[in-house]
Amino acid sequence: MKHLKAFDEAQNDIKAVQKRLSTSSTILSGIQKNMAHLNLLQIGVLSLIAVGSVFAGNPCLKGPPVPKNAAECCVTPFLVEPSAFMTCHSKWIGQTKRQMAMEGIPRGCCVAECVMNSTSLYSNGKIDREALTKLYLASTKSMAPEWNKITLDAIDGCFKMADTIKDEIEAGAKLTPAFEGEQICHPISGTILACMGMTLFAECPAKLFTVNDDCNKLKSYHSKCPFL
C-alpha cells in the first residue's frame, strides 16, 4: 500500500509524541468525572492524554508491538493525504526528539500543528471544527457508509475532551523556547489529532477490520496509545 513505509517511519517516533501529550494524573480524575457520558474508548483517550508518561509502566513508551502499519488493518477516514503528513513529520521530528528529554509541562506537537496549518484549520490556539469536519467527511465519501456517523461521533467526543483539559493545553502554549531555534507549538493540534486517530481505528467496523495476530495487537495498543 502506498506510503506504508513512510508511515512506519513515523510510528517509530511515537515516543516523542507521548511526551507532548502527557499531563498529570490529577487532571485525569477531574476529566473522568466531567465526561461520564463518553464511551469507554474516549475515556481511554483521556487517560492517555492526562496521564501520559507519569507511570513507569506506560505501554506507549516502547512504541507499537509489531512492525505493521495500522492502514493494513483498517483504512480509516483521514484529515490530510499521507504525503502531507510526512512533509510535516520530516520538518519537525528533529525538534520533537530533542524535546523528549525535557521535563515539566508537555510541549505542543509541531508535527500536528503543521498538519493543521497545511489545511488552514489552526489559528490562534483554535481549531476550525466545522472545516475539520468537512475534511474528515469528504474522506469518507468513497468508504463504507458506517464511517459517517463514526467520524461525527469521534469529532464530538474529541473536542469535548480537549475542552476539559483546556487549562493544561493553554499552559503548554505559553512555554518559552528552551533551546536555540525551538518553535513553540500549541498543544491543541496534537490533542485533537491523537484523539481522532485512536478513536477512528478503535471504532473500525468489524467487517472492515483485517483480523490477524498483528492487527489485533495493534488494535489493543492503539486503544491506549496515539498514532502520531
UniProtKB/Swiss-Prot annotation:
GO BP: sensory perception of smell
What pairs make up the disulfide bonds? C60-C225, C73-C215, C74-C204, C88-C114, C110-C185, C158-C195
Cell membrane listed as a keyword: no
Provide the protein's localization: Secreted
- What's noted about post-translational modification? Glycosylated.
Tissues expressed in: Head without antennae (at protein level).
Q: Which domain of life is it from?
A: Eukaryota
Q: Which GO terms describe its cellular component?
A: extracellular region
- Name the keywords, alphabetized: Disulfide bond, Glycoprotein, Olfaction, Secreted, Sensory transduction, Transport
Q: Answer whether the UniProt record assigns the keyword Disulfide bond to this protein.
A: yes
Give the molecular function GO annotations: odorant binding
Q: Which residues are glycosylated?
A: N117
Its main localization is secreted
Instruction: Give the UniProt family note.
Output: Belongs to the PBP/GOBP family.
Q: What does the protein in this record do?
A: Present in the aqueous fluid surrounding olfactory sensory dendrites and are thought to aid in the capture and transport of hydrophobic odorants into and through this fluid. Binds N-phenyl-1-naphthylamine, menthol, citronellal, 1-dodecanol, decanal, p-tert-butylbenzophenone, 4-hydroxy-4'-isopropylazobenzene, 2-pyrrolyl-p-methyl-azobenzene and indole. Expressed in mosquito head but barely detectable in antennae, which suggests that it may be present in mouth structures, such as palpi and proboscis, and may have a function in taste.
Q: What is this protein called?
A: Odorant-binding protein 47
Q: Which organism is it from?
A: Anopheles gambiae
What lineage is this protein's organism placed in? Eukaryota, Metazoa, Ecdysozoa, Arthropoda, Hexapoda
